[in-house]
């Protein structure tokens, strides 16, 4: 089990999980609030 915990704490795994979380968050924000990059005054 300690080997698995050591594997999960490596930088590429943490980086991949972080990118997946960030991409999912951006996708959901764009799904709920589309055209967020367009400034409509």
From Swiss-Prot:
GO terms for cellular component: chloroplast thylakoid membrane; photosystem I. SUPFAM superfamilies: Subunit IX of photosystem I reaction centre, PsaJ (SSF81544). It comes from the Eukaryota. Gene3D superfamilies: Single helix bin. InterPro entries: PSI_PsaJ, PSI_PsaJ_sf. It holds the Pfam family PSI_PsaJ. GO terms for biological process: photosynthesis. Keywords: Chloroplast, Membrane, Photosynthesis, Photosystem I, Plastid, Thylakoid, Transmembrane, Transmembrane helix. It is a single-pass membrane protein. It is found in: Plastid, Chloroplast thylakoid membrane. The chain crosses the membrane at residues 7-27. Belongs to the PsaJ family. May help in the organization of the PsaE and PsaF subunits. This is Photosystem I reaction center subunit IX. It comes from Bigelowiella natans.
């Amino acid at each position: 089990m300690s080997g698995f915990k050591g594997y999960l704490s490596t930088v590429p795994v943490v980086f991949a999980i972080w990118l997946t979380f960030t991409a999912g968050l951006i996708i959901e924000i764009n799904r709920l609030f589309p055209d967020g990059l367009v400034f409509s005054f």
